[in-house]
């Protein structure tokens, strides 16, 4: 049978995608159809489309190696002017008047739009009237005009603050593409900071760079959910403040990384007041400040995620859930060896009613400092079995826990610097403490430790049980010296 070769092309534009159908008829009886899907948003340059009459302003405060161009409705390319603050006649930005439906496209052969961070000078696009933003952002930072295929951002802070304070609205079918899979330090820092964006663009990179997404969506009140974040290889501060104060955010994506980096998630969802579910946190290798303030002030978050790590890092959980008022139960904390500041402020101002078990006998400086401070609903403390203390280890641990009533036992004999400093300050309902200390080895270990404790009208007696021959006395003065064994007036001293 005679063979025929027939090539037929058809292009269908649907939801921002071009579907090209290639039909190859090998013979009359066996045709084959192989659809090839292309993303029109990758093939189009960065485009700003006016939803209403207004103006688009482009501010270029930095001298770049190559000019930045724009075109309106596919017309002739025009150069964005450089703002010279020393020229009294210079206009601070390039003003583009637009009507509904006008499209402004942008191009540049530079590798970065940020060359003068030391003087806070950069490149910004702004518009107060509503505009769609779609197309490929790489049209702004591709030196070989290869932006359609470019997947690498080469220089630091390349697109920093690009759409700061803009009135972005979501196009019904088109999308903004950030296709880079190889990122640079701070490449997207503050990119949409304080903008009206409602749908975040896809972020396909699986290997991150330092500060790459830092403050990217900070204070974006209309953002409801995060984009997928598939990265498994993180970098220091990669998600730092990424969604800070996104007060409409209700959904957070999975965070699959098991090895963390310094401050990688620090402040990531802080002040996301509508967030109701935390992502799973499977990491077992932690880093300094990795979760610091991650969910701070997430006042609608009812449950803390599981925390499986058994080896901690300095300040790793510092203030992680601070001011999460709806969290009433702490996750299990399986680590037995503490690190400096590891749990400091972790549950401060939460709704906990009972402290989790803290089995460690190997403490570290500030390891439990302010851990449960201002937990007004906390009524039950936990056993503190450590007999060897460290500087500030329990400092402010239960301060302002006004409903704490359970008896406290403190078995350590030596008290280092500030170890019990303000530990039970304003625990108004606390009535019983057992302290076996016999020696102070550092300054201020008992500073304000029981100040105002047990002063609620419901408390009839207050008792401090102590080691024999320790010279405790009742005094309302601050304990500052190594011999100031002070307990407030009204407490009964009972020697073992």
PLM-predicted stretches and their roles:
Residues 20-24:
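C-terminal motif of bacterial Sec signal peptides marking the signal peptidase cleavage site
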Residues 26-496:
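Solvent-exposed loop and capping/linker segments of extracellular ligand-binding repeat ectodomains
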């Amino acid at each position: 049978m005679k063979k025929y070769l027939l090539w037929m092309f058809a292009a269908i534009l649907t939801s921002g995608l071009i579907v090209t159908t290639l039909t190859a008829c090998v013979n009359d009886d066996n045709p084959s159809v192989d659809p090839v899907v292309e993303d029109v948003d990758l093939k189009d340059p960065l485009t700003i489309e006016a939803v209403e009459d207004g103006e688009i302003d482009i501010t270029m405060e930095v001298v770049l190696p190559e000019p930045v161009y724009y075109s309106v409705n596919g017309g002739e390319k025009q150069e964005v002017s450089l703002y010279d603050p020393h020229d009294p006649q210079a206009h601070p930005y390039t003003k583009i008047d637009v009507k509904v439906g006008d499209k402004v496209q942008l191009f540049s052969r530079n590798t970065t739009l940020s060359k003068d961070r030391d003087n806070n000078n950069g490149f910004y696009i702004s518009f107060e009237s509503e505009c769609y933003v779609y197309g490929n952002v790489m049209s702004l930072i591709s030196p070989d005009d290869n932006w359609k295929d470019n997947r690498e951002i080469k220089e630091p802070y390349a697109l920093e603050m690009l759409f700061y304070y803009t009135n972005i609205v979501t196009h019904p079918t088109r999308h903004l593409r950030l296709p880079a899979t190889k990122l640079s330090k701070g490449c997207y820092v503050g990119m949409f900071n304080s903008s009206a964006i409602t749908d975040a663009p896809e972020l396909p990179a699986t290997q991150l760079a330092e500060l790459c997404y830092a403050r990217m969506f900070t204070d974006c009140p209309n953002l409801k959910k995060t984009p997928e974040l598939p990265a498994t290889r993180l970098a220091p501060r990669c998600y730092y403040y990424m969604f800070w104060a996104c007060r409409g955010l209700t959904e957070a994506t999975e965070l699959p990384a098991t090895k963390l980096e310094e401050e990688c998630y620090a402040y990531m969802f802080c002040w996301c007041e509508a967030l109701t579910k935390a992502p799973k946190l499977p990491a077992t290798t932690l880093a300094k400040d990795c979760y610091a303030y991650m969910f701070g002030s997430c006042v609608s978050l009812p449950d803390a995620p599981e925390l499986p790590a058994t080896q901690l890092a300095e300040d790793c959980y510092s203030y992680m859930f601070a001011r999460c008022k709806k969290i009433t139960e702490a996750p299990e904390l399986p680590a037995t060896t503490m690190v400096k500041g590891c749990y400091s402020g972790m549950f401060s101002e939460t709704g906990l009613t009972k402290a989790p078990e803290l089995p460690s006998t190997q403490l570290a400086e500030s390891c439990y400092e302010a851990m449960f401070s201002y937990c007004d609903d906390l009524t039950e403390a936990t056993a503190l079995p450590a007999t060897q203390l460290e500087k500030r280890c329990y400092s402010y641990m239960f301060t302002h826990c006004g409903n704490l009533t359970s008896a406290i036992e403190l078995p350590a004999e030596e008290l280092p610097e500030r170890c019990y400093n303000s530990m039970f300050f304003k625990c108004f309902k606390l009535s019983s403490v057992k302290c076996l200390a016999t020696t102070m080895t550092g300054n201020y270990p008992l500073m304000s430790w029981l100040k105002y404790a047990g002063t609620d009208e419901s408390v009839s007696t207050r008792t401090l049980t102590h080691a024999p021959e320790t010279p405790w006395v009742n005094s309302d003065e601050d304990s500052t010296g190594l011999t100031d064994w002070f307990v407030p007036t009204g407490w009964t001293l009972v020697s073992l």
